[in-house]
């Protein structure tokens, strides 16, 4: 028996890399990066990170959370039919074409897939069902719990890394003033180890799987599941806003998982879990946007000092350990309140730079370093500025 299980595990691992979504999302992720870079160059005449940064993020940041979720799914013995997995893959690919990660939330993808699967069962779509003989032998409570756990994982990965290297943007307020924003548009690969109903292995344990596998037999399947999170922030620091939303997503996922578990006793609660996930995620997105719009602009021009809107990697700004949201008040001992002042102050000492900074904790600190030939002329710092300041800096350089 152990040999058979080992063979099944090896086969499922090999199929992981043959899954169409694994390769499809390489193209999609590069497209995410291309669109981001194009927007950043249009606004700031430079990019924040290269196109491969999105690729590295997507294919590495979700590995450990995905494996942890797989352990939980395997321990519970949750089985997901092949037909439903096919629908999830198609809906995921369709959502990815929008290049908006917020549409790739598990609350949307899996909920819509469950509704489609339920509809196919209700209306007996024979041609489709015959293509997957056991593809829709669905234990709806198991899938509802699966949905809840996915949403919790989505919130966890967003809390952990969605705020990392957000993309800055500039817009014009209703008063005609430049306003800074931070955009998170992230996707994570979650490697999921699933049980799929079908001829293959049988459990000889009376307590496992917890969620019954129809027919009593199953096989293993590793799949690349892609989950997304998108958010625009202009009324606070991106880490603060994103982590608040991520916590709310985790709470939503917990509520969905509880409803899914309760549906073991009364199956219609699985439908309530789907509706809770779908409507709850929409509500959280609207709530975040309304609250953000109501808050005072965080990234705006100040009477004293320049607020850091973005930091280009591998530049002096990164060496100085500057953070988004900090305010630079003096450069080489000279007070600055616009980009022209900042650039002129740098010219007073081309070999050395000393900054006076108001940190995120409100305290003043000093950072300094040597300057070298060929380094970014603004230290790799992006500020909230208008076109006239761009022209002034260009003429000065």
Swiss-Prot record:
SMART domains for the chain:
PDZ (SM00228)
Q: What membrane topology term does the record carry?
A: Multi-pass membrane protein
Which positions fall inside the PDZ domain?
A: 279-363
GO terms for biological process, alphabetical: division septum assembly
The UniProt entry, under Pfam families, shows: PDZ_6
* InterPro entries noted in UniProt: PDZ, PDZ_6, PDZ_sf
Subcellular location as annotated: Cell membrane
Record's keyword annotation contains Cell cycle: yes
For the null mutant, the annotation states: Mutants show defects in homologous recombination, swarming motility and cell division.
What protein does this entry describe? Cell division topological determinant MinJ
Quaternary state and partners of this protein?
Interacts directly with DivIVA and MinD.
**Species, as recorded:** Bacillus subtilis (strain 168)
Q: Does the keyword Cell inner membrane apply?
A: no
Keyword annotations: Cell cycle, Cell division, Cell membrane, Membrane, Septation, Transmembrane, Transmembrane helix
What GO terms fall under cellular component here?
A: plasma membrane
General function of this protein: The main function of the Min system is to promote the disassembly of the cytokinetic ring after cell division, thereby ensuring that division occurs only once per cell cycle. MinJ acts as a bridge between DivIVA and MinD. May modulate activity and localization of MinD and MinC through direct interaction with MinD.
Q: Where are the transmembrane segments?
A: 15-35, 71-91, 103-123, 132-152, 187-207, 210-230, 249-269
Q: Give start-end of the signal peptide.
A: none
